[in-house]
Amino acid sequence: MAKSPKRKNSEPEDLSSNKRSKSFEFGKVENGLEPSGSDFGSDLPTPFDTMVTEQPLALPKASSPTTNLASPRNSSTPNLKTTSTTSKQSQKAEQKKNAGGSTGSTTASTTKPQQSDPDKLSDALLSAGVDIREEEALLSSTVARTKATGISANNQVPSHPPFLHPKNISDFMKRIASEQNFHQDFNKNTDILGLMSTACELYMRDVITNSLILSIHRRKGVKLNTGRRSEVSRSLRDLALRQKTQEERRVQRRIALGLEKQTTDARLDTEETQYRASNATANLMIAGGNKKKYSWLTAGSKSSSTDLKNQGNVSSAVAARGEMGIKYREAREEPGIVMRDLLLALENRRVGVNNVITKGYARIRD
């Protein structure tokens, strides 16, 4: 603050302490003057002079007020710490401001639309050896060519002929329609004829595919257990084979020595012959005709046992035992698709297959 303009301080600086103590006294104490005899004309110190002469107080910059009322012994170290922390905080604030300004400038630069001159771009492409007009013409020609090829491919006639002849389909449909009192010529409607041919083809394809799958499953069963279930059956089979060979050798020796004659019994038939005979009998009963008579159906007739003749010099006793009970017969499964597979495939369909299934089971052979 400025000093009073009316009064000037002419005293030296070393007497400032005395002036502070006598600021509110009227008169001079050293001379023993009374208040009534004080001289107001002399320059007396004022309260404003003391405020000017005092040193200004240093306020903290950014430190929070302390709550510790005790005076610390080492007052120099806390002051250094506070000044260092305040300087670090100020540096961080300045860095944040600078970062914010840089990001703002970058965003502003990115938001600004980039103006590109087409002439400059074309000049750059020409310098690189690229002609824009030629490239555009080539692109348009290729697009037109692909469209033309696609249209021609869509208009092509299918390579394979129809499944059924259109004339036969038309006659069949005309006959069925006339039975329902609906008279129309289907020769002109080629789309309907093609649709009927395709539907018949899909129907037959489905039936044949299912029959093929059923035949494969019929011939190739699922192998649940690849190994043998028991070793006892294997041992018994080996014993039976050894007994059979020993018996055949014994019979051969007896026939060679003339002790036993080679005889065949007409009543003995193999299992294969009996199997065929039973199938023929079943087919004859299903057909319902008695036109053919077989020798094995009449009593007292002798059947030709070809299987026994091909066995060699084996006695009737060995043949009567059925080859010692060791002949294994596998299931007779026909290769390919048979009537059973077709009937099973048709059984899954519910419409228009009743008569076909009945006739099929009547004609089946096994």
From Swiss-Prot:
GO biological process: one example: transcription initiation at RNA polymerase II promoter
Region annotation Disordered: where it falls in the sequence: 1-121
Entry's Gene Ontology cellular component terms: transcription factor TFIID complex
UniProt cross-references to InterPro entries, sorted A to Z: TAF4, TAF4_C
Keyword Transcription: yes
Molecular functions (GO terms): DNA binding; RNA polymerase II general transcription initiation factor activity
Subunit structure, interactors included: The 1.2 MDa TFIID complex is composed of TATA binding protein (TBP) and the 14 TBP-associated factors.
Official protein name in the record: Transcription initiation factor TFIID subunit 4
Species in which this protein is naturally found: Kluyveromyces lactis (strain ATCC 8585 / CBS 2359 / DSM 70799 / NBRC 1267 / NRRL Y-1140 / WM37)
Gene coding for it: TAF4
